[in-house]
Amino acid sequence: MTSVVVVGTQWGDEGKGKITDFLSSDAEVIARYQGGDNAGHTIVIDNKKFKLHLIPSGIFFPEKISVIGNGVVVNPKSLVKELAYLHEEGVTTDNLRISDRAHVILPYHIKLDQLQEEAKGDNKIGTTIKGIGPAYMDKAARVGIRIADLLDRDIFAERLKTNLAEKNRLFEKMYDSAPIAFDEIFEEYYAYGQEIKKYVTDTSVILNDALDAGKRVLFEGAQGVMLDIDQGTYPFVTSSNPVAGGVTIGSGVGPSKINKVVGVCKAYTSRVGDGPFPTELFDEVGERIREIGHEYGTTTGRPRRVGWFDSVVMRHSRRVSGITNLSLNSIDVLSGLETVKICVAYDLDGKRIDHYPASLEQLKRCKPIYEELPGWSEDITGVRSLEDLPENARNYVRRIGELVGVRISTFSVGPGREQTNILESVWATI
């Protein structure tokens, strides 16, 4: 039994897709356990970029099984579009498996997401308007439609009618918005269901059988710990649990079967959307990092907010996800800076604190306490070992490991597979 979980340790966009793709070469099954098509990940293969939102990164390995677990909310329209995109690029999807227990995102979820966000005005969350939150709301309220329901014409029709009646009352009475007709959804989405039917199965059986047989299983998280609905910067969070604990709920695999948790982070910090961000940069350094790092959302295209590396955030992520190994990305983006900074603690009303506050009001008053290190000017994109890094870059990497309290297993100096350097194989140490 061998399993590794890959989680984002910041606010998403840490490079999880790249690291999952890298670790997938030694895995036999790759599974996604939460989120929806609000999460974008970019994989670079032979200098060609592939952008995915729903399908696991392991799809590029035809001999390996790729799983969309029960904790994922699936927009069938987006999924069919993504499948077509992969087919056009010559990528086979015969190795894809989709949980029959996964919940379905429908047009009324997307409409409700938009109306709710507009109604919040200045207090908006900054969602991707993909219907993720409303779909998880229906799931918790026990009125959601699952993939298994979508495949049964009569059951889908019955449940869609019931849900539309409720949602349309909400649209008309609360939001003064036009209702959605049954015929606008039913045939189109039933057809999507039939198109993906061949991939649908009980994925918990596949995953547990693989683990019991001693196969290597890689679990791929979406978003990041700081967007977790319980452990993140609530309410500026997603509606699911990206933390490693989400694996057990979102994949149907027990906690005793999880061996390693790899936390993925960048050598700086970024986030999309609203919410607290103590180390955010508003100067030319921030603009430089954004441009060199191509910090624009895969899903939204929005410019990402950027800031210095925050070890307070990282220690919080380490604790709540049980991170055993760290994967540090985008070190190359900081090349050329005379000085690099790491936030080591916060100043809250004159008192030093080392933990991340739950209160948004306290977070607003937190000022980062920085440790400054000398930067480096060398081009490091061709570096293939820690020893080959310039001394200042090497010291920066080591200091991050010390402050977070987790050993660094891999570090990356660019987006390509070949630019990921192994310090310690997470598979070999299990």
UniProtKB/Swiss-Prot annotation:
IMP binds at D13, E14, G15, K16, N38, A39, G40, H41, T128, R142, Q223, T238, R302. The active site is at D13 (proton acceptor), H41 (proton donor). Mg(2+) binds at D13, G40. Keywords: Cytoplasm, GTP-binding, Ligase, Magnesium, Metal-binding, Nucleotide-binding, Purine biosynthesis. It comes from the Bacteria. Pfam families: Adenylsucc_synt. GTP binds at residues 12-18, 40-42, 304, 330-332, 412-414. It catalyses: IMP + L-aspartate + GTP = N(6)-(1,2-dicarboxyethyl)-AMP + GDP + phosphate + 2 H(+). InterPro entries: Adenylosuccin_syn_GTP-bd, Adenylosuccin_syn_Lys_AS, Adenylosuccinate_synth_dom1, Adenylosuccinate_synth_dom2, Adenylosuccinate_synth_dom3, Adenylosuccinate_synthetase, P-loop_NTPase. Belongs to the adenylosuccinate synthetase family. PANTHER family: ADENYLOSUCCINATE SYNTHETASE. HAMAP family: Adenylosucc_synth (MF_00011). Plays an important role in the de novo pathway of purine nucleotide biosynthesis. Catalyzes the first committed step in the biosynthesis of AMP from IMP. This is Adenylosuccinate synthetase. It comes from Streptococcus equi subsp. equi (strain 4047).
